[in-house]
Amino acid sequence: MFNVFHSYLLKFDNNAKIVPDLAESFKVSEDGLTYTYTLKKGIKFSDGSPLTAEDVAFSYLTIRDNGAGQIDFKAIADAKALNETTVEFKLKRRDSSFVTRTAKLGIVPKKGYAAKDYRMNPIGSGPFKMVKYEPGQQLIVEPNPQYYGKKSQFKRITFLFLSNETALAHAQSGKLDVVMVQPEYAKEKVAGMHLVTLPTIDTRGFHLPTFAPKKIDGKEYGNPVTADIAVRKALNIGINRKEIVEHSLNGIGTPATALLHNMPWANPAAEFKDGRLEEAKKILKDAGWKLNKDGIREKNGTLCAFNMLGISSDMQRYDIAVGVAEQAKKLGIKITPKAYGWKQARTLTPTTPLCWGTGDYDPSGDLVGYFGSKGSINDARYSNPTVDKHIEEALDAKTNEEAYEIWKKVQWDGKTGPESENGDLPYLWIVTINHTYFVKDDLDIGKQLVHPHGHGWPVAFNLSEWKRK
């Protein structure tokens, strides 16, 4: 949604390449600590006020100080306007992902900005402006007459927030032009619409708590089963992900044994062959997990059994958990799938695996978040000093390109790491999903970039390019 209303210093084009947006150019100092962006002249916010370097500096310092969203700008020491069209960022330390992150933060006006009310009345410089927003119901937008880029041919666009079943029913009744559907509905027939299946970097997988139960600040953490590397490895190499995709996702998606694929910073050595059932059984047996009379493994009185969480508002994740549970049975591991709302599920993640969705064009977003010992989404509580060292080295590189080979070491450096079948395996990655939409036959949604994770919004990244055929 942010993309609809706001502009960025830089942006991703339809080929996922970083290109100018608000900024016409930028330069980086030799020591990698100063970034200077020169803005295009004459850009205005949707209310007609000029967008200046002061607004850019304000936007970055606000997110740095408030920690809003999931973009990490803690490395910024200062941001200031040198003049109306030049903004300078001083960093405390080098950050190779800084340029990429400047393609992720929308610019807001310094004057009159109020964080509490802003989502109900956003003032941006992007291709659209808000007409009406009813949380959980609908969002109505119209073209921003001040926008400096390609103008939409549509006078007004309405986004409806619907359940999967309701969305499909509305599509079948001819009330929608575009509707995202879960794979379980993708083989339905909808008159006047066609299925569009779009490739992504959007991966699904489960964190596996890496240590035995203990209390931290009075709260329970850890899991007695997934704490055993033998269980984590047996699950990773033993299950058949292709069968899970076929049975749980209608065959739509690509099996994934690692977090990253087909990206310049993805390490091919992190991937491995799965479906090695007998080898996985032997790993469990050798580790002391013996089958009981019910066909479930036990070790020192502990059943090889645990819950696995999906999300009640995203049944795709629950369906994946069901598929994993069916595969785990063959290993003598009892997994019980559960579905909760997101907030409740997050209260359970210190002890219980949850299905995560992720995929980012910023390498640090996923690799620091999931694998860094202080990562914001490292619910596996994975900690490896060598991995942390590689992360620091990658961030300290002068450019993203220089960092790519180091990011590969974060995943697996040949001796240690979270990924590869010989790694620590704090996650059980399952699939890189496809995003599936029914689209009206007379609507052209333009060239789509390979979608990142985004809960249905990535299809609208090029909304101003959509047109009737």
Predicted regions and their residues:
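N-terminal lobe/hinge region of extracytoplasmic solute-binding protein
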Residues: 1-30, 61, 123
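Gly/Pro-rich hinge or "lid" segments in bacterial periplasmic/extracellular proteins
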Residues: 13, 101-152, 156, 166, ...
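Aromatic- and charge-enriched surface segment that lines or borders ligand/interaction sites
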Residues: 24-67, 82, 88, 170, ...
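Surface-exposed binding/hinge segments that line
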Residues: 27, 31-38, 71-112
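Alpha-helical secondary-structure segments
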Residues: 52-59, 84-86, 126-127, 155-156, ...
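Detector for C-terminal structural segments
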Residues: 134, 143, 204, 236-268, ...
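Ligand-site clamp/hinge motif
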Residues: 144-189, 325, 334-336
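Ligand/substrate-recognition segments at binding pockets and active sites
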Residues: 289-359, 435
